[in-house]
Amino acid sequence: MASHSLMSPSPLTSHSLLRSSFSGVSVKLSPQFSTLSRSKFQPLSVVAAAKKAVAVLKGNSTVEGVVTLTQENESPTTVNVRITGLTPGLHGFHLHEYGDTTNGCISTGPHFNPNQLTHGAPEDEIRHAGDLGNIIADANGVAEATIVDNQIPLTGPNSVIGRALVVHELEDDLGKGGHELSLSTGNAGGRLACGVVGLTPV
């Protein structure tokens, strides 16, 4: 096959040309087209999008509420709680294993506990991941709280999406009450209302 030559349309001096040959083809290009300025190209940085989830709590009583969960990157999850219809005082508040409410809140199963530890306070090293402590209802039965916790991520193998948040009848003793249920449920009594955690637009 005859050799073919591709030339730049404008006159170029020999020192301003780059030559490359392959398969009998000779290519001559101006450096301004063949050389890319590194200063114009910056490495791409990947930023994980923030995640947001919501749970609407309902039960067989007048207790109801809305809980939102937000997380940015690998930071702890922020939980904003507002529940109404409670008796004044402390109420256990937990994340439970399953998002199954076919039999009411009882079918949400035990506390979310991927590490198979005993029940404790949110600040304890030994605790269920779903141990979120107590929320406090005021004289009007309204509980508002903000919880920041690093064991309830919205992504990854231990994601809480599809699990259920539950508010309980009694105060959670945080595993320190000496009751036979202290190290499993905090002896927090019945389940007043629950809601499945689902993703929502940020």
UniProtKB/Swiss-Prot annotation:
Q: Cofactor binding mode, per the note?
A: Binds 1 copper ion per subunit.
Q: Which positions bind Zn(2+)? A: H111, H119, H128, D131
The subcellular location is: Plastid, Chloroplast
Cite a GO CC annotation: chloroplast
As recorded in UniProt, its EC number(s) are: 1.15.1.1
Q: Which residues form the signal peptide?
A: none
Task: Tell me the Pfam families matching this sequence.
Answer: Sod_Cu
Which keywords does UniProt give here?
Antioxidant, Chloroplast, Copper, Disulfide bond, Metal-binding, Oxidoreductase, Plastid, Transit peptide, Zinc
Q: Which InterPro entries match?
A: SOD-like_Cu/Zn_dom_sf (IPR036423), SOD_Cu/Zn_/chaperone (IPR024134), SOD_Cu/Zn_BS (IPR018152), SOD_Cu_Zn_dom (IPR001424)
Q: What does this protein do?
A: Destroys radicals which are normally produced within the cells and which are toxic to biological systems.
What is known about its subunit structure?
Answer: Homotetramer.
* Family according to the record: Belongs to the Cu-Zn superoxide dismutase family.
- Protein name, UniProt field: Superoxide dismutase [Cu-Zn], chloroplastic
Gene field: SODCP
